[in-house]
Design a protein with these regions (language model features):
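Pocket-edge structural micro-motifs
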Residues: 78, 89-91, 107
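Aromatic-lined, polymer-binding surfaces characteristic
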Residues: 94-185
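Extreme N-terminal leader/anchor segments
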Residues: 11-83
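Repeat-mediated protein-protein interaction surfaces in helical alpha-solenoids
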Residues: 83-89
Length: 185
């Protein structure tokens, strides 16, 4: 009986929180919140993208500390955890998973000396995150990861760029283009 009351009380708190949040949204924001939750994300399958011109080194500074030294154990937001093959494991907080999907390690301090690890992270991400599935395919994660990948790719000779990486990069850019965040404007 007491458990039922607590469940009902928690549900009422969530309802009032939702109501209080929704009342400040514009109609367009509300529409796109519902639209993006109902609509299934898709990624258009494309042919292999072609490189146009030579890539040059990215001139930006590296200021972040690496979050991983082995590609298996990561520290984000003060929480260290060992990652298996599941980049979307529900036991990790969503913000922690977002940080994992950003792949900031590709451009962290000393990353130029960790090429094998960077390649492993990209290959592992592609293998564990099919197109349009999971946290990594949400717009904010996509936008940050795309920038990190491009910056990292710019440090490689074009013959070292794997075909799978370019296809994934193209799919991610396409997916981001299809998920404009009207619901937060």
């Amino acid at each position: 009986m007491q458990t039922d009351c607590r469940i009902l009380e928690a549900a009422m708190k969530r309802f009032w929180l939702l109501l209080n949040t929704v009342r400040y949204l514009k109609l367009s924001q509300l529409f796109y919140q519902v639209f993006y939750r109902v609509r299934k994300r898709r990624s258009k399958i494309q042919s292999e993208p072609e490189l146009r011109g030579a890539l040059g080194p990215w001139p930006g500074a590296q200021f972040l500390q690496p979050a991983s030294v082995d590609g298996k154990t990561f520290t984000f937001l003060g929480q260290t955890a060992r990652l298996g093959d599941d980049w979307n494991h529900p036991s990790f907080p969503k913000l922690w998973l977002y940080n994992l999907h950003y792949q900031d390690d590709l451009n962290a301090k000393g990353s130029e000396d960790r090429r094998e690890l960077s390649e492993y992270l990209i290959d592992s991400w592609i293998a564990a995150n099919p197109p349009a599935e999971g946290n990594g395919w949400e717009p904010y994660c996509l936008s940050l990861r795309l920038v990190n990948w491009v910056k990292w790719f710019c440090r490689l000779e074009s013959q070292h760029l794997k075909r799978e990486w370019l296809i994934s990069l193209s799919r991610q850019a396409d997916s981001l283009e299809r998920q404009l965040e009207f619901h937060i404007l």
